[in-house]
A protein has these predicted regions:
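A structural signal for small-residue-enriched, beta-sheet-centric alpha/beta enzyme cores
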Residues: 1-90, 94, 100-406
């Protein structure tokens, strides 16, 4: 399938506009803290959420709002998570009402999200006072400001869009996301808001999203913490004019492929922007007996704090990788395992058939100092493969999280 990446982010698909402003939730006036994505018509909608038992109030409200598979807008604040508050659900519902009243739509058509400090009450006055400005500023170039408004400890905005064909019709998917810490998903430990002008039923949209999430966001880990507010929401306007997707046909597969491409872009950028991170680390496991084994092994390596620390130090300590494979719970023959490191600096094999082999430390260092490093693991037992995404573990990670509330 031919696919091209374009500008415009979450406002690139037909029917969508976006905006982001500073309303006053955050003390720093230079930081935007309120984002809005809006569609001119009713959308088919789907979402997946954190599996943390401590669940943010916005998720409770959003689940109810899109239980009919419909939505028209997404509103999100940063700075306060609205989690573990006695009046959290009431506040999230009121946030929907404030937004809906300003847009002239039903509050049940709002996806609401919050990100920030857990356990602190959210003051809705700044949101009330800023909503008119937020709505009046909605525009086709607003994805950038919306992406900035949902950031917390992120250092770069995360925004992508792509264009592809469905039944001869030009279709687009756009997305923004945030997340650099508390990323170890059982779904997608961050926020991602995705829009499309494809015509696809809510049922098929949810199916496609679940299919994509398991190979993208679920294979991402920055620090082993699963957050409380994580949401991936998708709105489909249907304005591109394709024949509505209601089954797993060729158009469904093409749409899912495009959605996967966008989500992979987001995941890699989130991994690279992990709190304090200096590099993206991708573990690709091949030669597994089945898909589950490949995923378990790749995720175990990426989640290892010792592997992360070795990547920070550009240390080719392959023993830590075998250790992570060994405790992963996967049924593998460690005596068959080969390990290589690869990057723009070159490629080097450091382990063969589960044992160390002579290698150049100088070349290994050259490979591992690059800002994108691949850990290549071959189990040599089958034909299945999987990739997991993460980053190195640095001094700055501790500093950022030690100072988070200040």
């Amino acid at each position: 399938m031919k696919l091209s990446f374009i500008g415009g982010g979450v406002a690139a698909p037909k029917g969508f506009t976006a905006n982001g402003i500073h309303c006053g939730i955050r003390k720093n006036k230079e930081k935007k803290d309120l984002a809005l994505i809006y569609c001119e018509k009713d959308c088919d909608a789907a979402a997946v959420y954190t599996q943390n038992l401590v669940c943010g109030a916005p998720i409770t409200v959003t689940r109810e709002n899109i239980s009919d598979g419909k939505a028209r807008a997404i509103v999100c604040n940063s700075g306060i998570a609205n989690t573990c508050n006695a009046d959290g659900v009431e506040k999230a519902e009121e946030m929907c009402k404030i937004t809906a009243d300003a847009l002239g739509i039903s509050k049940s058509d709002i996806v609401v999200a919050s990100t920030g400090v857990i356990g602190q009450p959210i003051d809705l006055e700044p949101i009330k006072n800023g909503m008119a400005k937020l709505v009046s500023g909605l525009n086709k170039d607003g994805s950038d400001s919306a992406a900035n408004a949902i950031m917390t400890t992120d250092t770069v905005k995360k925004e992508f869009a792509c264009e592809f064909s469905l039944g001869g019709k030009k279709c687009r998917i756009g997305a923004i996301s945030k997340g650099s810490g508390m990323i170890h998903p059982n779904m997608a430990t961050m926020l991602a808001f995705i829009t499309t002008d494809a015509d696809i039923s809510a049922e098929m949209l949810k199916k496609s999203l679940l299919e994509v999430v398991k190979d993208s966001f679920n294979m991402l880990s920055v620090d082993g913490d699963t957050s409380t507010n994580d949401t991936v929401a998708v709105l489909a306007s249907g304005l591109c004019g394709n024949e509505k997707i209601t089954s797993e046909n060729a158009d469904y597969k093409a749409f899912t492929c495009a959605l996967a491409a966008i989500c992979e872009k987001l995941v890699k950028l989130m991994a690279k922007d992990g709190e304090g991170a200096t590099k993206l680390v991708e573990c690709i496991v091949s030669g597994a007996d089945d898909q589950k084994t490949a995923k378990i092994c790749a995720k175990s390596v990426i989640c290892s704090s010792l592997v992360k620390a070795a990547m920070f130090g550009a240390d080719a300590n392959w023993g830590r990788i075998l250790c992570a494979l060994g405790y992963s719970g996967a049924d593998i023959d460690v005596h068959k395992v080969d390990v290589k490191f690869s990057s723009a600096g070159g490629e080097i094999e450091v382990c063969k058939d589960g044992s160390g082999i002579p290698f150049s430390e100088e070349l290994a260092k050259k490979v591992l100092v690059c800002d994108e490093v691949y850990i290549l693991v071959d189990l040599k037992s089958g034909s299945f493969s999987a990739a997991a995404y993460g980053c190195d573990l640095t001094y700055d990670y501790v500093k950022i999280n030690g100072d988070y509330r200040t």
